Amino acid sequence: MEKLTVIKVGGKIVEEEATLYKLLDDFAAIEGYKVLVHGGGRSATKLAAQLAIESKMVNGRRITDTETLKVVTMVYGGLVNKNIVAGLQARGVNALGLTGADMDVIRSVKRPVKEVDYGFVGDVKQVNDAFLADLIHKGVVPVMAPLTHDGDGHMLNTNADTIAGETAKALAGLFDVTLVFCFEKKGVLRDENDDDSVIPQITPEEFKQYVADGVIQGGMIPKLENSFEALNAGVSEVVITLASAINGNSGTRIRK
């Protein structure tokens, strides 16, 4: 199968000019087919504040009410996405910015209310792998914003890690897929205060033990759960690494 690299980058990376430019340089240098999925939470929070819209968070997750949905749609699908696309075009990468609503790329359902009502947040149900594969084979690089739709005319805010994972899983039957989660650390750390304490690889058994011991906690837990789900669904390799190291062999590799 032909190789495909799916890169997910967090908002902190794409919202700072210096780190964004470095990321785009490195991403442009990746050989073969590729997809970029991005966040943008800090920019959304900033615009919401400028518009006097309160940003509400529960356990690090945004509550997306009607006004907040307007903000994230503008920021994720507009400002952040188009800045990335323009930057890639300047580097000779023929990129196309997409939300889940465009060509029905990603359809989701509104998350049911349990302990917390997260509002207009979507859980992915379907990825249009045929359309994405057609784009990719034509030499177009999809740049995917963390927005989906429900098929009934409503946009939904959706976790970017989830979009990257579901996209990688959907395309794993058509390509040899490597999924890379990029953030501000060198990888999964044994000690969050020591940037050099990178765990080089993690198996499911080791993951359970690290969680039990409190080594892995917080937002890293769902990131790793997404990683194992992707591997079980046919993705060849999952890497968690520093954004500036996407072309190297550093970081943490997730193993089955």
Sequence positions of predicted segments:
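C-terminal catalytic "cap/lid" subdomain
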Residues: M1-K256
